[in-house]
């Protein structure tokens, strides 16, 4: 037996195995936590795949929040007692772990009652700024979701960990907006309809409750290409 040749082959095989293991570990580390949501695979959406009305509303509210952010440390857009609660939350946020922060933000906004866009703004569909929502102290699912998104951004949560998700709820045959947040313990869903109001839930436990339609943040747009008839469902739940 050629010991030298055998040793060389073993060395090559070992190096290949190590390279493959490193590649697998790197791939796992770089995996997009939002690649699949509620059991459905996400696809980057082009202009033809993403609804124009969603893009229009999102572009407007994003610009408004960037030009005049509502929730600063002085809580200038809030009235008592909301301002005091926000200032307290803002002071504690830096020391909170991820899940405690999500529960706190969920609770802060979910304490407000639900109402429709028609009741608040006299139109069928409106994407409010956080200031609009908090001044009225009520809103529909979009209002809660948008406000939670911008609140978490104000607390330093990066955009790539956040997704606004338009979903379909088959049990109610309606569309509904929620916020998905990536953490070290997985992706959690912030919904205005949950009780207790601070409840956050892992996305993988909600496959039967939500069918994702579209997803967006400041940098991207995604579609899940569900059945077309879901897009013709009733208006969003409040």
Residue spans for each PLM region:
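Compositionally biased, intrinsically disordered low-complexity regions
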Residues: 7, 18, 236-237
């Amino acid at each position: 037996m050629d010991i030298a040749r055998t040793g060389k082959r073993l060395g090559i095989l070992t190096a290949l195995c190590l390279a493959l293991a490193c590649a697998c570990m790197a791939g796992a580390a770089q995996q997009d936590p939002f690649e699949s949501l509620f059991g459905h695979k996400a696809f980057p959406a082009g202009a033809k795949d993403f609804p124009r009305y969603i893009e229009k509303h999102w572009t407007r509210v994003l610009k408004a929040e960037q030009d005049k952010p509502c929730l600063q440390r002085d809580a200038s857009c809030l009235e008592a007692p909301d301002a005091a609660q926000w200032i307290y939350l803002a002071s504690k946020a830096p020391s909170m772990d991820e899940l405690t922060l999500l529960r706190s933000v969920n609770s802060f906004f979910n304490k407000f009652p639900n109402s429709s866009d028609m009741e608040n703004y006299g139109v069928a569909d409106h994407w409010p700024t956080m200031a609009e929502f908090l001044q009225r102290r009520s809103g529909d699912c979009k209002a809660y979701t948008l406000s939670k998104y911008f609140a978490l951004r104000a607390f330093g949560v990066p955009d790539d960990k956040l997704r606004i998700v338009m979903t379909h709820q088959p049990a109610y045959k309606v569309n509904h907006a929620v916020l998905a947040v990536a953490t070290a313990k997985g992706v959690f869903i912030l919904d205005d309809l949950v009780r207790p109001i601070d409840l956050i839930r892992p996305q993988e436990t909600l496959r039967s409750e939500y069918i994702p339609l579209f997803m967006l943040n400041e940098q991207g747009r995604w579609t899940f290409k569900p059945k077309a008839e879901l897009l013709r469902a009733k208006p969003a739940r409040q």
